[in-house]
Curated annotation (Swiss-Prot):
Short motif (Cell attachment site): ranges: 27-29
InterPro entries on file: Disintegrin_CS (IPR018358), Disintegrin_dom (IPR001762), Disintegrin_dom_sf (IPR036436)
Presence of keyword Cell cycle: no
Function: Inhibits ADP-induced human, canine and rabbit platelet aggregation by binding with high affinity to alpha-IIb/beta-3 (ITGA2B/ITGB3).
Family assignment from sequence similarity: Belongs to the venom metalloproteinase (M12B) family. P-II subfamily. P-IIa sub-subfamily.
Protein name (record): Disintegrin multisquamatin
Expression tissues: Expressed by the venom gland.
GO molecular function: toxin activity
Quaternary state and interactors: Monomer.
Length: 52
């Protein structure tokens, strides 16, 4: 009861991590990716350039 997710970079103890939690650290000129509090996936930072 009350489970929001099973697993993923933005899921801990069956709950979504709060919005703004870093789920992927930046590399080089890249930018950090943050959880949005609504999904267990790590959404791509909208301010990044195209994926390479």
């Amino acid at each position: 009861e009350g489970e929001e997710c099973e697993s993923g970079p933005c899921c801990r103890n069956c709950k979504f991590l709060k919005e703004g939690t870093i789920c992927k650290r930046a590399r080089g000129d890249d930018m950090d990716d943050y959880c949005n509090g609504k999904t267990c996936d790590c959404p791509r930072n909208p301010h990044k350039g195209p994926a390479t």
